């Protein structure tokens, strides 16, 4: 995006510093993958196309941040459709709703149609010779810092582990007792940042880290897990048991 500043650049009105690149780089490095950093791509379709074509030739997976919403300068999803296919876009979750997943075809391969096997089964991330030759899986993450971390942990990390041959790639969920009331409407999955502790009786307890805005980095810094409030769930009362995705040791 044109609004992205690299570290060391002077601040300017309407611009934000590039924090997501360093977050994703750290998460990927911890997984043990080889990272190819292509830097910041400006809001020009031609530049984005060139970057995607280059990345699809060099990598098994492409991860972007921003450009997947509905703004005039959000070209990522359009370019995904032009150069490959979109398996899904927009998820009933918070934070991270505008996430997109698809595939970018490499040179010499035609883009897949919406009825392709990949579009029909977005879980088929297992890497093999055929899929590697035909391009790269693309994860279009949101632009908000917390949404980037949540979507990486919930979607990207398990998918990459599958591509690496791991059979147990899904993050484990623990049960903990909520020590506070949490407001939640049914109809979407919410990942609230939380702190898990051990109660006097040895049971796991969890509380939120406060403001859950998708741009509030402090909510993630203070957390050691994500409180997973499932699609069907409503309000959580004090004493209710909830699922927690613990990421201490992951981040």
Residue ranges of model-derived segments:
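Phosphate-binding glycine-rich loops and their immediate beta-loop-alpha structural context
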Residues: 1-64
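Short glycine-rich anion-binding loops that position phosphate/pyrophosphate groups of nucleotides
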Residues: 2-3, 67-70, 143
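Thr-Gly-centered strand-to-loop micro-motif
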Residues: 7, 38, 64-66, 89, ...
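Short acidic, glycine/serine/threonine-rich loops at helix termini
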Residues: 7-11, 48-50, 74-76, 103, ...
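Residue-level "edge-of-site" marker
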Residues: 41, 69, 93
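Catalytic-core segments of thiol-dependent peptidases
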Residues: 60-69, 84
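Short Gly/Thr/Asp-enriched flexible loops that form oxyanion-binding sites at enzyme active sites
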Residues: 71-83
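Flexible glycine/proline-rich
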Residues: 81-112, 118-120, 124-251
């Amino acid at each position: 995006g044109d609004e992205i500043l690299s570290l060391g650049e002077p601040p300017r009105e309407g611009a934000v510093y590039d924090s997501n690149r360093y977050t994703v780089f750290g998460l990927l490095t911890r997984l043990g993958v080889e990272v190819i950093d292509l830097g910041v791509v400006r809001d020009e379709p031609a530049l984005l196309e060139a970057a995607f074509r280059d990345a699809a030739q060099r990598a098994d997976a492409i991860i972007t941040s921003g450009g997947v919403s509905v703004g005039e300068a959000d070209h990522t999803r359009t370019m995904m459709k032009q150069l490959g296919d979109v398996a899904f876009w927009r998820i009933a979750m918070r934070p991270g709703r505008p996430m997109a997943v698809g595939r970018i075809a490499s040179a010499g391969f035609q883009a897949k149609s919406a009825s392709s096997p990949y579009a029909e089964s977005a879980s088929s991330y297992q890497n093999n010779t055929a899929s590697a030759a035909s391009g790269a899986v693309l994860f279009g993450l949101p632009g908000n810092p917390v949404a980037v971390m949540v979507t990486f942990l919930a979607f990207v990390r398990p998918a990459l582990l599958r591509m690496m041959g791991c059979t147990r790639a899904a993050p484990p969920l623990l049960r903990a007792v909520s020590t506070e009331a949490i407001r939640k409407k049914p109809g979407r999955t919410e990942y609230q940042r939380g702190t898990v502790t051990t109660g006097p009786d040895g049971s796991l307890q969890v509380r939120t880290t406060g403001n859950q805005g998708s741009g509030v980095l402090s909510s993630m810094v203070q957390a050691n897990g994500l409180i997973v409030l499932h699609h069907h769930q409503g309000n959580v009362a004090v004493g209710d048991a909830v699922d927690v995705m613990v990421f201490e040791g992951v981040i």
